[in-house]
Amino acid sequence: DLSVRGAYVDETRLYGNFTSLALAVQGQENQAIKAELICPQDFYEVNGVEVSLATALAEKMHQQAEQTIYQLTADNYEQLTDSPFEIAEQDEFWFDVKSGENTIAHRFVISGVHHSDLERLETDLSKICQSYVDWLGDTPFDDYLFMTMATSSDYGGLEHLASTSLITPRDDLPTFFEQAEPSESYQRFLGLCSHEYFHAWWVKTVRPEVFLNANFNQETYTTLLWVFEGFTSYVDDFMLQKSGVISQHSYLKLLAEQINRYYQTHGRALQSVAESSFDAWIKLYRSDENTANAGISYYNKGALVALCLDFALINHGKRIFDVIKVFYDKAKAQDNRRFGMTDANLDDVMNECLPKDVWQDFNAKYIDGTTELPLFELLSEQGVSIEQKDDDITWGMKYMSEPTGLKVQRVVRNSQAAAAGISANDVIVAIDGLKASEKWLKSTAKTQTISEDPAVCHVFRRDELLVLEVPPVSDAHVKQPQTWMLSIVNEKKVNVWMQI
């Protein structure tokens, strides 16, 4: 499993999460643990390169009988399973972050083939990390490790107590020709680093109460993932501009991508963001071609709920960053530096920051309900203009051209294609008697706006031929997704919003 969730071994790399490698001994989960990684000398001699160990655990190494043995120690089973390791050829750099009178060491290691400008990455990443510590006051860790694997196209990250494990397309890493303003692909990697780094405070330290002593034998459910992943998905890109690594203009482009994704998800009218949080195990991580029609992502909508909540708080002299800081301070007051959030104590904090009726109305409409988020109204109040650019999603379906015709990938709920009975994985071979092609599809759809006649499609579903009629567009069909672009019209208001 090459992902950040499991374990992986080949002749160049040993990687593992102890959740995949070490069973808990019932009743002894809180005892100190020693784990040994025994590597045969052959592993080091395959490519004749120097390899290193990366892990947030305390470690020692010694040689014995043609073997290299790494001894890792953890205070308990939780720390062991929350500290992945990698042994591989690695490039690395270190940087320090100031935390009051203290200096917090940060290590970044990267494996896999890459040709990236690590000096540029060090400069940018150190600014981002420093911005978090300046805001939150200190760190919940003594030192921190970024562990990254570069591949051709894989993407993901997983937060841990004092580290994060990342996998990224090598094209997302900074080049030696990177402009002062990071490229969109490099911004994506910085956003990933920012997201997982913030989780050290906002998931590992402050977390849903049901996660404090989670049972590893089963899934643990909560309706609060919109708070933890949603707030993080708002804060991660926000901190890129707050740190000065990207411009306000670039940040608005990233925010527009979130907004576009939200409006292209028709399931937002059917599922609340709280329900989406609860369904993470059974729906979000088992998505299919109908997911966008049936539900909403607590990452995506959660980020935009956080944006709207931040604007509501601004109107009452507070920020969402104040709310997060209140919970982090509660965690620091605990002996184990952990705090469990519940719906009740979230209400308590929000009622201190907002009038009670404002919070109750917001919660009922946008968190527990499916009322459309007032994004454009609120952005306009903060000095941001919104321009609309129509997307030509013909008949309300995503498709790809193949030699046999047009293969349908996804059908939008209540669209013309849905009304005709077209489904994902259908192959449209002919439209109105002519071979189906993207050009002919668009021409037919354009003609329908004038003639208002149905289009006759010959469609293969598996090996069965169907004849389906696609009606002309009408008010009964859902308005197709659109692209929104944001720009600054009032710099003074925007500057107030984009500071903490």
Task: Enumerate the language-model features and the residues they cover.
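C-terminal recognition in membrane/secretory proteostasis and scaffolding
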Residues: 236, 246-500
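Post-HExxH zinc-binding segment in Zn-dependent metallohydrolases
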Residues: 164-172, 205-206, 217-268
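Solvent-exposed, acidic/flexible segments
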Residues: 28, 114, 118-125, 183-191, ...
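Short, glycine/acidic-rich hinge or "gate" loops at secondary-structure transitions
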Residues: 143-148, 209-215, 244-255, 320-323
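Non-catalytic architectural context of zinc metalloproteases
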Residues: 1-130, 134-141, 154, 171
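Juxtacatalytic substrate-recognition/specificity segment
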Residues: 96-225, 235
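A generic secondary-structure signal for well-formed alpha-helical elements
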Residues: 43, 136-140, 196-205, 209, ...
